[in-house]
């Protein structure tokens, strides 16, 4: 059985055999000659066969990142930047897969370039776009609020000026009590009894509340009686007779000289309302 001191000494001797740290030019030349002549294989065997006191991981990283012939040097081109941004949007932080799609670039190099340059640039562009959007939306809200305030001020000014004119006596106080329920008051219209059968048709077309705030009045097309018309004609004839028909001009003579009023009023005229109901 081997003594513990001997086993510890052997293990420490093996550890001391593996070199760490910077690579010397002689080590780089040994690794390059072996890789060009034998090709890539198991990296532990490469370290042993090349006569290097390095581990397999150290040989692999040295070859991929520094010694391989197709390795690109220098800054990234704009095309490479676009590819990195596109691949990163698809693959995320899988730098080895991104490097496999960019010939001549290493995963460590791509990761450092992303964190130092591209990531900051994209963040700055997003902040600028958000600032532009906020500045473009703020004038619209300001214009809307200013228009609303201006309209409210205009209404207040109109009402205030109207009240001041009323206080000074320029406006009749009775004008302030305007009936809005009926825009055509019946007091100022000629009253006449007419048939209301046409009212449902008017309501069906224009609606019941077709006025400003109340019902819009449409005179019916057919009337049952014509007393109001006869009364107005008779009053007009009386005035002409009182003033003297002989002195009146030829165009202002009484109507009886031209036609018979009784016969005219008793003549049956086809009604539009009757034809309208028949067509329906």
UniProtKB/Swiss-Prot annotation:
Decide whether keyword Ribosomal protein is in the record.
Answer: no
The Gene Ontology biological process terms listed for this entry are: defense response to fungus; plant-type secondary cell wall biogenesis; positive regulation of DNA-templated transcription; positive regulation of secondary cell wall biogenesis; regulation of secondary cell wall biogenesis
Which keywords label this protein?
A: Activator, DNA-binding, Nucleus, Repeat, Transcription, Transcription regulation
- What is the annotated localization of this protein? Nucleus
Give a Gene Ontology cellular component term annotated to this protein.
nucleus
Q: In which tissues is it expressed?
A: Expressed at low levels in stems and siliques, specifically in xylem.
The terms under GO molecular function for this entry are: DNA-binding transcription factor activity; transcription cis-regulatory region binding
| Induction field | Slightly induced by salicylic acid (SA). Positively regulated by SND1 and homolog proteins.
Q: What happens when the gene is disrupted?
A: No visible phenotype under normal growth conditions, but the double mutant plants myb48 and myb83 nearly lack secondary wall thickening, stop growing after developing one to two pairs of small leaves and subsequently die.
- Region annotation (Disordered) maps to 129-150
Task: Name the PROSITE patterns on file.
Answer: HTH_MYB (PS51294)
Q: Which InterPro entries match?
A: Homeodomain-like_sf, Myb_dom, Plant_SW-associated_TFs, SANT/Myb
Key word Ion transport present in the record?
no
Q: The HTH myb-type domain covers which part of the protein?
A: 15-67, 68-122
Q: What does this protein do?
A: Transcription activator. Involved in the regulation of secondary wall biosynthesis in fibers and vessels. Transcription activator of the mannan synthase CSLA9 that recognizes and binds to the DNA consensus sequence 5'-[AG][GT]T[AT]GGT[GA]-3' cis-regulatory element of CSLA9 promoter. Transcription factor that acts as a molecular switch in the NAC012/SND1-mediated transcriptional network regulating secondary wall biosynthesis. Is directly activated by NAC012/SND1.
Q: In the UniProt entry for this protein, what further remark is given in the free-text comments?
A: Plants over-expressing MYB46 show a significant increase in mannan synthase activity and mannan content in plant.
Stated name of the protein: Transcription factor MYB46
**Record lineage:** Eukaryota, Viridiplantae, Streptophyta, Embryophyta, Tracheophyta
């Amino acid at each position: 059985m081997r003594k513990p001191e001997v086993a510890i000494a052997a293990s420490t001797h093996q550890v001391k055999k593996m070199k760490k740290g910077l690579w010397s030019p002689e080590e780089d030349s040994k690794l390059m000659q072996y890789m060009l002549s034998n090709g890539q294989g198991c990296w532990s065997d490469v370290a042993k066969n090349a006569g290097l006191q390095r581990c397999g991981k150290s040989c692999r990283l040295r070859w991929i990142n520094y010694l391989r012939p197709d390795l690109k040097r220098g800054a990234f081109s704009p095309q490479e930047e676009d590819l990195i941004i596109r691949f990163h949007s698809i693959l995320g932080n899988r730098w080895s897969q991104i490097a496999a799609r960019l010939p001549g670039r290493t995963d460590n190099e791509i990761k450092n370039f992303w964190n130092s340059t591209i990531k900051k640039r994209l963040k700055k562009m997003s902040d600028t776009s958000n600032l532009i959007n906020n500045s473009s939306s703020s004038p619209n809200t300001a214009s809307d609020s200013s228009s609303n305030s201006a309209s409210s001020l205009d209404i207040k000014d109109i009402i205030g000026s109207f009240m001041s004119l009323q206080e000074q006596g320029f406006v009749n106080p009775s004008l302030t009590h305007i009936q809005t329920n009926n825009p055509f008051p019946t007091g100022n219209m000629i009253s006449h009894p007419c048939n209301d059968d046409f009212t449902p048709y008017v309501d069906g077309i224009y609606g019941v509340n077709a006025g400003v705030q109340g019902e819009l009045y449409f005179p019916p097309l057919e009337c049952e009686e014509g007393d109001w018309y006869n009364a107005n004609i008779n009053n007009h004839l009386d005035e002409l007779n009182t003033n003297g028909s002989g002195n009146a001009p030829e165009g202002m003579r009484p109507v009886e000289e031209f036609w018979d009023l009784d016969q005219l009023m008793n003549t049956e005229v086809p009604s539009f309302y009757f034809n309208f109901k028949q067509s329906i």
